Regions:
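Short glycine-rich anion-binding loops that position phosphate/pyrophosphate groups of nucleotides
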Residues: 43-44, 68, 112-116
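N-terminal small-domain helix-loop-helix segment of the aminotransferase-like
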Residues: 1-45, 49
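Active-site phosphate-binding strand-loop segment of PLP-dependent enzymes
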Residues: 88-128
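Glycine/Thr-rich phosphate-binding loops of Rossmann-like dinucleotide-binding domains
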Residues: 47-50, 71-72, 117-118
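Short acidic capping loops at alpha-helix termini that bridge into adjacent secondary structure
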Residues: 33-37, 57-60, 104
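A short helix-loop-beta submotif of the ANL/AMP-binding
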Residues: 78-82
């Protein structure tokens, strides 16, 4: 019973909503300022934050066919134009994606490995 009592102490407290300790630890580990780190409730939340910061209703967002389902949802949620590039063998066609970029393109989403197809792109090809 003592172990249970000890384990339950503090369970009624809410976690730090700003992630102060986590941001400090990440900043220390990756040698960046804590203010450069944004935390979110999973990738969906972070992708929406990124879209809202960098794009708007006049923007285009490029992503591959068969890419992560959240990309078109996030694009639609901010009223941006979705530019879906046809996939090749269920994977990203990086050359076609690059050609799809216009002056209105604010984001290019590339999942690697891709979800849901599990195809991947080697790092060297991503650094264009």
């Amino acid at each position: 019973m003592k172990a249970i009592e000890t384990a339950f102490q503090g369970l009624c407290r809410y976690p730090d909503g700003g992630g102060f300790k986590l941001k400090a630890a990440l900043a220390d580990r990756y040698n960046v300022e804590a203010g450069q780190i944004t935390l979110g409730n999973g990738s969906n939340d972070l992708l929406e934050i990124v879209a809202r910061v960098f794009a708007d209703s006049t923007s285009e967002i490029v992503f591959s066919q068969y890419a992560f389902a959240v990309y078109p949802i996030v694009t639609q949620s901010i009223g941006a134009k979705a530019v879906e590039v046809p996939a090749v063998n269920w994977g990203h066609d990086l050359q076609a994606m690059e050609k799809a970029i216009t002056d209105n393109t604010k984001l290019v989403f590339i999942a690697n490995p891709n979800n849901p197809t599990s195809t991947d792109v080697v790092k060297k090809k991503l650094l264009f």
